[in-house]
From Swiss-Prot:
Region annotation (Interaction with RNA) ranges: 123-128
Binding, S-adenosyl-L-methionine: 40, 65, 92, 117
S-S pairs: none
Stated role: Catalyzes the formation of N(7)-methylguanine at position 46 (m7G46) in tRNA.
One term under GO cellular component: tRNA methyltransferase complex
Record InterPro entries: SAM-dependent_MTases_sf (IPR029063), tRNA_(Gua-N-7)_MeTrfase_Trmb (IPR003358), tRNA_methyltr_TrmB_bact (IPR055361)
Superkingdom per UniProt: Bacteria
Protein name in UniProt: tRNA (guanine-N(7)-)-methyltransferase
Matching PANTHER family: 3-DEOXY-D-MANNO-OCTULOSONIC-ACID TRANSFERASE/TRNA GUANINE-N 7 - -METHYLTRANSFERASE, TRNA (GUANINE-N(7)-)-METHYLTRANSFERASE
UniProt similarity note: Belongs to the class I-like SAM-binding methyltransferase superfamily. TrmB family.
Active-site annotation: 117
EC class of the enzyme, as a word: transferase
Biological source species: Synechocystis sp. (strain ATCC 27184 / PCC 6803 / Kazusa)
Reaction(s) the record says it catalyses: guanosine(46) in tRNA + S-adenosyl-L-methionine = N(7)-methylguanosine(46) in tRNA + S-adenosyl-L-homocysteine
């Protein structure tokens, strides 16, 4: 299958992306909805959830991506491989995130935000993915002990995400150092592999939902 070509950055504030994410009938996309669920926000081509689903058949994986062609391609790949613990959704996670998470199964255990679009300019801060409303929604959806993994190769972006989650009293860091040297999940994203090959640093942290 030919690789889908897409725009690198998409403005999440444009009218096209202002619809609330619609959750599927979970029983139709997963063969066992009781498995713990990992949500990967901004999954791009979905290679990370795909590899995780292959390596961890005892978990369900959900990728959310704002670029629809990538979601269509990713679901086609998952279907072709017969993975019953993997699904992708198209949409903007920051449109009424509480409503989106309220339709989740009660099995959410982990959320990851990895290498999001950086939106460097100060006036574009509202386009960044880790908005306060999303952080609150994640905190409300995760059970005690649930995890959040944050990664970026752009230090100001990583620091901004880190600060947003640190400001929420429902999260604590699992490590004493500012950044983790290694990916705690052991499965790199495509961007992470590229950074490794270029000897470019990656700034990552892992948080846990408090009781």
């Amino acid at each position: 299958m030919a690789r889908v070509r897409i725009r690198q950055h998409v403005n999440p504030l444009s009218e096209k992306y202002r619809q609330v994410l619609a959750c599927p009938d979970w029983a139709t996309v997963y063969d066992d909805v009781q498995r713990p669920l990992h949500l990967d926000i901004g999954c791009a081509r979905g290679r990370f959830p795909l590899k995780m689903a292959q390596q961890h058949p005892d978990w369900n994986f959900l990728g959310v991506e704002i670029r629809q062609p990538l979601v269509l391609e990713a679901n086609e790949t998952g279907d072709r491989l017969g993975l019953k613990n993997l699904h992708y959704l198209f949409g903007n996670i920051n449109v009424e995130p509480e409503k989106f998470f309220s339709a989740f199964p009660p099995t959410l255990q982990r959320v990851s935000i990895q290498f999001p679009d950086p939106w460097f300019k100060q006036r574009h801060n509202k386009r960044r993915v880790a908005q306060p409303e999303l952080v609150t929604a994640i905190a409300n959806a995760l059970p005690p002990g649930g995890e959040v993994l944050l990664q970026s190769d752009v230090e100001p972006v990583a620091q901004d995400m880190r600060d947003r989650f640190a400001e929420n009293d429902n999260f604590v860091f699992t490590h004493d150092t500012p950044w983790l040297a290694e990916n705690p999940l052991g499965v790199p994203t495509e961007r992470e592999i590229a950074c490794f090959n270029l000897q470019r640093p990656v700034y990552r942290c892992l948080l846990q939902r408090t009781p």
